[in-house]
A protein has these predicted regions:
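Rossmann-like dinucleotide-binding cores of NAD(P)H-dependent redox enzymes
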Residues: 1-28, 112-116, 134-142, 147
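Generic secondary-structure signature for well-ordered alpha-helical cores
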Residues: 14, 18-19, 31, 70, ...
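A general beta-strand register signal
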Residues: 21, 40-41, 77, 144, ...
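Aromatic-rich beta-strand edge motifs centered on tyrosine
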Residues: 29-33, 178
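FAD-site-proximal beta/loop scaffold in flavoenzymes
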Residues: 32-40, 45-125, 211, 217
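Mid-to-C-terminal Rossmann-like scaffold of FAD/NAD(P)H-dependent oxidoreductases
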Residues: 96-197
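A short, polar/charged loop-to-alpha-helix boundary motif
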Residues: 193-210
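Cysteine/selenocysteine-centered motifs that mediate thiol-based redox chemistry or coordinate metal-sulfur cofactors
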Residues: 209-240
Length: 240
């Protein structure tokens, strides 16, 4: 999320009884036998608890890949199109593999189901002698918190020259579209997900927006896509 949308989500969660302790980490837990009763924060404050969930991000388990002599950074380095590793006979896909974000070229772990599926299909095809490749990977997420629908995609915190955005905000909704070089490269949608599919397709397809008829914020439509793309989407992705 960006800063404004994060504040909206936080306010909504606090309304439902959640409390935030920002900028703090848990330094230790106080237990009675095997039961956690309290945790101590970095600032010395103690919080009672019935259940302690530890969640500080994910890191791929790469010990096997390293033992096999594969090139590993934060994850296993692969060809982003074929998923071939530094060993030509070994392929990697999914959360263990470093992805290349198609929108800015950065290398990162994109531990998301759609990316894992695309990479797995490409790796399987390549190992079987086929030529299927990964079309491109990027971040996309959708979640619901107590009825607050949140969708994000692409470069939502991009900064620097060449990036612009459009924002529409209300008390319980938020829409932000991020642009670069005349194309949509990211969005944040909160209680405004009606056109999420079209926005995602505009991003993944790299569709130029110049000269398009209609308001992108309120009324994007399939006629903005090339004819062959429109036909495929209307047929549910099946080529007839």
């Amino acid at each position: 999320l960006d800063e404004k949308s994060a504040k909206l989500v936080r306010r909504h969660l606090e309304h439902h009884g959640l409390r935030f302790h920002l900028g703090q980490t848990v330094t230790r837990a106080k237990c009675s036998g095997k039961t956690v009763q309290r945790v101590v924060l970095q600032n010395g404050k103690e919080l009672p608890c019935d259940l302690l969930v530890v969640a500080v991000g994910v890191r791929p388990a790469t010990a096997l890949a390293e033992a096999a002599g594969l090139t590993v950074e934060r994850g296993i380095i692969t060809d982003p199109a074929t998923m071939q590793t530094s060993d030509p006979d070994i392929y990697a896909a999914g959360d263990c593999a470093v992805s290349v974000d198609m929108l800015d070229g950065s290398k990162k772990i994109l531990a998301l189901w759609p990316n894992a599926v695309a990479q797995g299909r490409a790796a399987g095809s390549q190992m079987a002698g086929g030529d299927l490749t990964v079309g491109g990977t990027y971040a996309v997420n959708a979640i619901d918190f107590y009825g607050l629908r949140i969708c994000t995609c692409g470069l939502i915190n991009a900064k620097g020259d060449g990036y612009t955005d459009r924002v529409a905000a209300a008390d319980d909704s938020y829409k932000r579209l991020v642009f670069r070089d005349g194309k949509l490269v990211g969005y944040v949608l909160i209680n405004a997900s009606e056109n999420a599919g079209i926005y995602t397709s505009l991003i993944s397809g790299g569709v130029p927006l110049e000269g398009l008829q209609g308001d992108l914020m309120d009324s994007p439509n399939l006629f903005w896509f090339p004819k062959e793309t429109r036909i495929t989407k209307l047929r549910g992705g099946v080529q007839l």
